[in-house]
Amino acid sequence: MAKSSASSLSSAKPVAAGPDASAPALPVSYEAALQELEGLVSRLESGQLPLDQLLAGYQRGAQLLKFCRDRLEAVETQIKVLEGTELKPWLQA
């Protein structure tokens, strides 16, 4: 049932940082990216993934994290513009 490392590597989904037809597409929304990232973290933390899938998962996670951070930064920039470039303090109840 164990695969050789060469066949395991060839069966892994490639994840590339640049535009690549074989790389998974980025989610359409922050929420979708966050949901995928949370599921990925759970699978990575389970300790049940083979090494090649751990690497692919880590790479995908880094891609999703960058997407989420970029979206948050874009929204923060828009809020700054709407608020006159100065954010109001966040009041927690």
UniProtKB/Swiss-Prot annotation:
Q: List UniProt keywords, sorted A-Z.
A: Cytoplasm, Exonuclease, Hydrolase, Nuclease
Quote the EC number. Answer: 3.1.11.6
Cell compartments where the protein resides: Cytoplasm
Q: GO cellular-component terms in the record? A: cytosol; exodeoxyribonuclease VII complex
Coiled-coil ranges from the UniProt annotation: none
**Annotated GO MF terms:** exodeoxyribonuclease VII activity
What's the subunit arrangement here? Heterooligomer composed of large and small subunits.
What job does the chain carry out?
Bidirectionally degrades single-stranded DNA into large acid-insoluble oligonucleotides, which are then degraded further into small acid-soluble oligonucleotides.
User: PANTHER family, alphabetically?
Assistant: EXODEOXYRIBONUCLEASE 7 SMALL SUBUNIT
Q: What is this protein called?
A: Exodeoxyribonuclease 7 small subunit
State the encoding gene: xseB
